[in-house]
């Protein structure tokens, strides 16, 4: 499955969330990560994020897709993701 993770978390947790997600996904731009994961990896990511965030004040949205969708970028692409064939 392909996931896109977007988050809005307290300043004191931003670096922890970013560091955690970098271990599993590709950084796209500020507060956005994406990548191909297995179901087990997806569950580990969810559980890891739950341990870091404050569910009463932070927000994490995870979009689940079957595969990497076509993408159109307006402006500069901060971290281009190349498809590996």
UniProtKB/Swiss-Prot annotation:
The answer to whether UniProt assigns keyword Magnesium to this entry is yes
Q: Specify whether Metal-binding is a keyword of the entry.
A: yes
Under the GO molecular function aspect, what terms does this record hold? metal ion binding; RNA endonuclease activity
Where, by residue number, does Mg(2+) bind?
A: 8
Q: Which domain of life is it from?
A: Archaea
What InterPro entries does the database record attribute to this sequence?
Answer: CRISPR_associated_Cas2, Virulence_VapD/CRISPR_Cas2
Arranged from A to Z, the UniProt key words for this protein are:
Antiviral defense, Endonuclease, Hydrolase, Magnesium, Metal-binding, Nuclease
Q: What is its EC number?
A: 3.1.-.-
Q: Which cofactor does it need?
A: Mg(2+)
GO terms of biological process kind? defense response to virus; maintenance of CRISPR repeat elements
Oligomeric state and interaction partners are given as: Homodimer, forms a heterotetramer with a Cas1 homodimer.
Cited function? CRISPR (clustered regularly interspaced short palindromic repeat), is an adaptive immune system that provides protection against mobile genetic elements (viruses, transposable elements and conjugative plasmids). CRISPR clusters contain sequences complementary to antecedent mobile elements and target invading nucleic acids. CRISPR clusters are transcribed and processed into CRISPR RNA (crRNA). Functions as a ssRNA-specific endoribonuclease. Involved in the integration of spacer DNA into the CRISPR cassette.
For this chain, the family text in UniProt reads: Belongs to the CRISPR-associated endoribonuclease Cas2 protein family.
**PANTHER family noted in UniProt:** CRISPR-ASSOCIATED ENDORIBONUCLEASE CAS2 (PTHR34405:SF1)
Report the protein name in the record.
Answer: CRISPR-associated endoribonuclease Cas2
